[in-house]
Amino acid sequence: MFRRLNDAQIQYRAARGSGDKRGLLVVSSGGIGDSILFSLMIERFITLVGDDDPVTLVVRSESLGVGFLFPSRVNLIGVDYRRFIRDGAYKRQVCAELRALNVQIAISSDHLRLPTVDDVMVMATGAAQKFALRPRTWPKHDRALAQHEAWYT
């Protein structure tokens, strides 16, 4: 019950974001190996925004060590996913930080995404455009993922 209230509060605050949005936020929830592979793809995402627009990549905390593989333009934010799921105060803190970025575009780059983490972070940005891959069938989360489709552009 508290998780739903927390998510509703995050969604409400995201909807009240400020007007002039710019930049890109990408959520890449894989492990270190996935982050290494994603470093080869980030340039394609960067082309979605202007040369002067900020680019932020959210990764699992343990993937911050491969940050040197990404262009200097990319700001990495590490998130402890287990703590994000279990600790409401931490979740609100992370979501407030993402909302403060005031991005134009937010993307969840994973085919296997968690509705309790990836979707919440993308929604929390209040971005004008929100994108995600169609999720792979996942019986445990199918219902929530289907409900969250309305959040995306």
Label every model-predicted segment.
Residues M1-T153:
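Catalytic machinery of carbohydrate-active enzymes
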